[in-house]
Regions:
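Active-site-adjacent structural segments surrounding the nucleophilic cysteine of cysteine proteases
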Residues: 78-247
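Aromatic sugar-binding surface patches on proteins
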Residues: 441-463
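Short, compositionally biased P/S/T/A/G/V-rich stretches that sit at domain boundaries
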Residues: 342-413, 426-430, 497-541
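Catalytic Cys-His active-site segments of thiol-dependent hydrolases/isopeptidases
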Residues: 70-85, 313-335
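Short, non-transmembrane alpha-helical segments in secretory-pathway proteins
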Residues: 19-49
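Extended low-complexity, serine/threonine- and proline-enriched intrinsically disordered segments
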Residues: 413-441, 544
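Noncatalytic regulatory segments and standalone regulatory/sensor domains
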Residues: 23-24, 28, 56-57, 79-127, ...
């Protein structure tokens, strides 16, 4: 029977949950030597003292390049490495810092029991499967931002806005393909600080020949500067760039920009919308086809984007951070597997949500990417999305059952026009029956545009008739169908367990629908490793 009462309980909380084991800097140094050709390693410059004894990761500079190793022995030992350059903790590209912050939070989540540790045995001397494809080492400052809006800084000096990492990543992809010869169309938008920002792409012919790999001070001409600055401006405008000292754009702006203004086929894949193995396969397949991709993450300070253009036998991805070549190297992008989250982890357990953008020039004879629906459930306003049964269970076989889809998001990278439903699947995964199709439409019966990156924060009711379902155990999943397409399961694996027996039907959510509605206070000291008690109020909204 479903318990609907709100209950008051006392919970004994430990001040420390230790699943992993912190390793010392000396132990990390020994690990780093395994990945050095000469065995000569040194702690990275400017590592603060508070990060050297209880660190989530350790960075060591080599004679050439650097290595980053995990600070926890339950994790994969190697985190990332570079064959050139050095690591300076005080001069880390923001995109890389986001990734490192995410890793640090992942280690903390593992050590507190909120996430599963991921440990894979690696080769000490990995070989490259796909060599880095992109040769440009571009940045966000001059001359790249020469055509960006101007602003006045705190010292009353006129400065140019940064191009934005999103534009720099996009521009490097386009330079790799040297495409298109000329843009398409016109676009403008209103910016709260700079007014109307616009570009007439159709008037712009891109001077690919005069875009060089490196723009070192005093080593490029005005023509070369203008060539790259125009490309950067057009990329920024097409992405609806929020210009400023630090500029940013949404991952969901990429695919429309590539398609509408630059004659590319493009597809956006959100990591939350597919299994890690599939996500990795999409990346490696694209790289093996000789096409670099854009990798995006969203953190507390906004979105970041960078280029992934190769990988090694450990499946570490080669990253071009878009910071003038600084810190480019091979990194483990699989450490934040969403499947490793524990109960309560949800989609907000780590600092960034991840996705990739694929792009290929839409030339004659080139097949465009297939549109793949990526509808899924997300955490919104501290409410976890999912699929829930509205009524009391069990019910009589033959009755209609109302099933709610909560916090449904479109992560497809393109607008969705179509219908939602629920499907009943047997133990073999075969579709047995479906509910009533619910078209997303307006009052005139026209399909609504479910824009990319948006969500329905209201519960969407689906109706399932249980007549004709044979006795047995089933799984009920949310389904979507783009207009003129086929039914597909939601990318989220959320489901209901259905049991049909003796004329009764029972639907149970395997995902707890429990919310914290109140928490008491604790008067006293809390010591590491010692338990303490506090009263909290929770509400069980689950089917059981």
């Amino acid at each position: 029977m479903k318990r609907t009462t709100t209950i008051l309980i006392a919970i004994c909380v430990s001040a420390l949950f230790a699943n992993g084991k912190q390793i010392s800097q000396n132990a990390a140094l020994s690990a780093a030597r395994k990945y050095s050709r000469t065995g000569q390693v040194a702690p990275a410059k400017n590592l603060r003292s508070d990060k050297t004894n209880n660190a989530p990761y350790y960075a060591f500079n080599l004679e050439q390049g650097y290595v980053i190793v995990s600070g926890d022995d339950e994790m994969t030992e190697l985190v990332g490495y570079a064959e050139n350059g050095f690591f300076d903790a005080e001069n880390v590209p923001p995109q890389m810092q986001l990734w490192l912050d995410g890793y640090a939070e992942y280690v903390a989540a593992v050590q507190s029991g909120k996430a599963k540790a991921r440990k894979i045995l690696l080769s000490d001397s990995p070989s490259v499967v796909v060599e880095p494809l992109v040769t440009t080492k571009w940045n966000q400052d001059a001359p790249f931002n020469n055509f960006a809006p101007e602003y006045t800084d705190d010292n009353n000096n006129t400065q140019r806005c940064a191009t934005g990492c999103a534009a720099t990543a996009m521009a490097q992809i386009m330079k790799f393909h040297n495409w298109p010869e000329q843009g398409v169309g016109h676009y403008s938008y209103e910016h709260q600080s700079f007014g109307t920002i616009s570009s007439n792409f159709s008037e712009h012919v891109y001077d690919w020949t005069n875009m060089i790999d490196r723009y070192n001070n005093g080593e490029y001409s005005n023509v070369q500067a203008d060539a790259v600055a125009l490309l950067m401006k057009d990329c920024g405008v097409s992405l609806n760039m929020n210009y400023g000292p630090v500029s940013g754009a949404s991952i969901y702006s990429y695919t429309p920009a590539f398609k509408n203004y630059f004659r590319y086929s493009s597809r956006t894949v959100n990591r939350s919308g597919c299994e890690t193995a599939e996500f990795t396969r999409i990346i490696t397949d694209e790289l093996q086809e000789g096409r670099p991709i854009i990798y995006c993450g969203t953190g507390e300070d906004g979105g970041h984007a960078f280029v992934v253009d190769g990988y090694d036998t450990n499946y570490f991805l080669h990253v071009n951070w878009g910071w003038g070549g600084y810190s480019d190297g091979y990194f483990d992008m699989n450490y934040m597997d969403p499947a490793g989250l524990g109960i309560g982890g949800g989609s907000g357990a780590f600092k960034w949500n991840q996705g990739i953008v694929l792009a290929r020039p839409l030339k004659d004879g080139v097949e465009p990417y297939e549109f793949i629906q990526q509808l899924c459930f997300v955490l919104f306003n501290d409410v976890q999305g999912g699929i829930f049964c509205k009524q009391e269970m069990p019910t009589n076989k033959g009755d209609d059952v109302t099933i709610l889809l909560r916090n449904t998001a479109n992560l497809s990278g393109e607008s969705f026009f179509g219908s939602l439903n629920v499907g009943v699947f047997d133990d073999s995964g075969a579709l047995v029956t479906m509910g009533n199709e619910e078209r997303l439409e307006n009052n005139n019966g026209e399909l609504l545009e479910f824009q990319s990156g948006r969500l329905y924060s209201v519960d969407l009711p689906m109706t399932l008739n249980t007549a004709g379902i044979a006795d047995g155990n089933y799984i009920v999943r949310a389904m979507s169908k783009a207009n003129g397409n086929v039914w597909r399961k939601f990318a989220s694996t959320d489901c209901l367990n259905m049991t049909v027996a003796d004329g009764k039907v029972s639907l149970v959510s395997p995902t707890p629908n429990i919310s914290l509605t109140g928490i008491g206070s604790y008067n006293g000291n809390v010591y590491k490793g010692n338990p303490f008690s506090v009263n909290i109020t929770i509400h069980n909204g689950s089917s059981i």
